[in-house]
């Protein structure tokens, strides 16, 4: 029994010794800076260059009802204390002048007498009291100080808005007869208490150097990006094909409605590089489409056949999927699309999708074989209507007037009536008395 008690005592002594060694090693860094006589006591302001930058533009600190923390954070380094003596560190704020301030025309100017302050708030550092070695081992931060404009207790510092203050640090020796060891202040830490930042330069500095302001910065940048309009020159005729958010990277091989002599004023601002499919996703256009297509219009067609979308008005709209656009050539072809002259009236209607072709059968059924329209590839033309309701995707049967030849590079379409649908009127197109064939102009890239 005696042996067991002896073992427990040795274990306890070893634990206490280990803990004391940990405490001693922690305070050793502070002891090296100590002076039992306190004659070499010195206090240094940390981040002095940062404080100086704020002082040059007259620093401001926010005060709120619930209290707001300071930035820059007041941080000091102390040396010359008695390592084995107990000290408490206190912080208060003293007015620097005898008037209040106002921000006028980009600068702070005096604005009358100050408010009478009947209160005196002092902040006690939460590590107080502690050994001198503890205070000297590392910089001392007053990061938990909160500034308020309402006297509500809770250890917050009450300040009057639009008054200038200077922080003061006090070191008090405790453990016996309390006595003041030192008090000091730093002119570069002066600031004006405000309920909202007045100087934009102060706001910029706070955001730049305060790591906790990064969330505010990110939110501000996002809102700024939302406010930026997509600027397009007024001299340009911009016509995008809004097929599921895709734009053509090689649009000069796509047919355009209108007279062969008509050309767009300036090239479309499209990027030069090409992707594998010959078109580039441009999600930014999705939010600007007047009538976005449903997802069914982006059906990917890997076969040489042509997709037909039939609307309630018996108009057939023919276009190919994105994979077929790879066959578009960068040089215009004279045989891209040839349109026969018809004696029927042509009524171009408004459409948010310019430069598209529609095939209509006014007779309500097949009207007999019409002239063939040849394209160099299945995706060499786009056919669309001004309005689409109840889209249904189907493969074009040969009996419907659309003939798909065996050659993948050749598509023949037989129609009875061609109707040009474009957002721009084109002179010399169709009409009674006209003759000959009209080839649509190529879309400039």
UniProtKB/Swiss-Prot annotation:
PROSITE patterns: TBOX_1 (PS01283), TBOX_2 (PS01264), TBOX_3 (PS50252). SMART domains: TBOX. Keywords: Activator, DNA-binding, Nucleus, Repressor, Transcription, Transcription regulation. It is found in: Nucleus. One of its GO terms (cellular component) is nucleus. Gene3D superfamilies: Transcription factor, T-box. The keyword Repressor applies. Residues 45-218 bind DNA. Its main location: nucleus. It comes from the Eukaryota. GO terms for biological process: cell fate specification; heart morphogenesis; mesoderm formation; positive regulation of DNA-templated transcription; regulation of transcription by RNA polymerase II. Transcriptional regulator involved in developmental processes. Can activate POMC gene expression and repress the alpha glycoprotein subunit and thyroid-stimulating hormone beta promoters. This is T-box transcription factor TBX19.
């Amino acid at each position: 029994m005696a042996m067991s008690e002896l073992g427990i005592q040795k274990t306890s002594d070893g634990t206490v010794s280990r803990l004391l060694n940990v405490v001693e090693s922690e305070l050793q860094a502070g002891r090296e800076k100590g002076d039992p006589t306190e004659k070499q006591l010195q206090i240094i302001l940390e981040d002095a260059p940062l404080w100086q930058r704020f002082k040059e533009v007259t620093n401001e600190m926010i005060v709120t009802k619930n209290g707001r923390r300071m930035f820059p954070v007041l941080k000091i380094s102390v040396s010359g204390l008695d390592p084995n003596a107990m000290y408490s560190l206190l912080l208060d704020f003293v007015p620097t002048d005898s008037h209040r301030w106002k921000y006028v025309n980009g600068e702070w100017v005096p604005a009358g007498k100050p408010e009478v302050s009947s209160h005196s708030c002092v902040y006690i550092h939460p590590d107080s009291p502690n050994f001198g070695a503890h205070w000297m081992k590392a910089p001392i931060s007053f990061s938990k100080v909160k500034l308020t404009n309402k006297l509500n207790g809770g250890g917050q510092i009450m300040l009057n808005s639009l008054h200038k203050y200077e922080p003061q640090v006090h070191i008090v020796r405790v453990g016996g007869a309390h006595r003041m060891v030192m008090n000091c202040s730093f002119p570069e830490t002066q600031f004006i208490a405000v309920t909202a930042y007045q100087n934009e330069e102060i706001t910029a500095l706070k955001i730049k150097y305060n790591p906790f302001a990064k969330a505010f910065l990110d939110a501000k940048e996002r809102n700024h990006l939302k406010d930026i309009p997509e600027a397009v020159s007024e001299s340009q005729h911009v016509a995008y094909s809004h097929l599921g958010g895709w734009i053509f990277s090689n649009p000069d091989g796509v047919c355009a409605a209108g007279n062969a002599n008509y050309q767009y004023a300036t090239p479309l601002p499209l990027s030069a590089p090409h992707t594998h499919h010959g078109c580039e996703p441009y999600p930014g256009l999705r939010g600007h489409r007047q009538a976005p297509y449903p997802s069914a219009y982006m059906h990917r067609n890997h076969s040489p056949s042509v997709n037909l979308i039939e609307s309630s008005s018996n108009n057939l709209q023919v276009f190919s999927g994105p994979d077929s656009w790879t066959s578009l050539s960068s040089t215009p072809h004279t045989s891209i699309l040839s349109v026969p002259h018809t004696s029927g009236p042509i009524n171009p209607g408004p459409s948010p999708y310019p430069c598209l072709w529609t095939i209509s059968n006014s007779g309500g059924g097949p009207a007999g074989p019409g002239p063939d329209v040849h394209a160099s590839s299945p995706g060499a033309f786009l056919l669309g209507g001004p309005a689409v309701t109840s889209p249904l995707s189907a493969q074009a049967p040969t009996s419907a007037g659309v003939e798909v030849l065996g050659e993948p590079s050749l598509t023949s379409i037989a129609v009875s009536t061609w109707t040009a649908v474009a957002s721009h009127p084109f002179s010399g197109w169709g009409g009674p008395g006209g003759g000959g064939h009209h080839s649509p102009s190529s879309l400039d890239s």
